[in-house]
Amino acid sequence: VLGNVLVVFPAVLALAALIALATGHPAISEKQAEHVFESLHLLGPSLFFAAFTGVLLFASSIIAGWTENWFVLHRMDSALHYNPRITGLLGAERAARWARFLRENLSGFAANISLGFMLGLVPAFAAFFGLGLDVRHVTLSTGQVAAAGATLGLQVLQLPAFWWAVASLPFLGALNVSVSFYLAFSLALRAQNVSGVDRSRIYAAIRARLRTAPLSFFVPERRGPLATTAQG
């Protein structure tokens, strides 16, 4: 999460600068920039929308799991590897590489593609039915803040609305991650038929980890060659 945010913000700033340089106009208008800050205000409905986005993240992981299970169940990697037409077109070695690549990365493709569709279509369907439901993905919201800031220039630093939007970003990320993690964790406990006593121990371990190393839930641990060798 943190890595995505740190990459997206300067990348969007650079892209907005290129668009302004090439077209002579900012990537988004000043009115749109002001609307971005209003929609991401910390005291608005953004936190609720971020929690709902966590549900969509969980749903995309379910779709990814289904896709990978289907791929493995039907032995699609073997079908791609040994299919005469595919091997005749690509060659045996290249067909094997494609089969291995899809076996290792198909779930990631399914998760990202399905999440993209849901982030784009769910608000549209919700608006059609008059639900007023929106999504707040921390990475996309960070990009919106960067684009709006690029439009308004340095004067944006003097706007309280900008700082309210920036302040909301950590909470959006925390809700995205925590809601999707909770749903995935609950599903895993049910799938493994974990008893109530064992669940209490697991919850206690998670709370202890939150107290001692809260950033580990957002920033992955670095594992060097020595740690990998020791575990092996």
Set out the residue ranges of the language-model regions.
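Hydrophobic alpha-helical transmembrane segments of multipass membrane transporters and ion channels
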Residues: 2-7, 11, 52, 110, ...
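Membrane-water interface at transmembrane helix exits
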Residues: 3, 12-20, 65, 127, ...
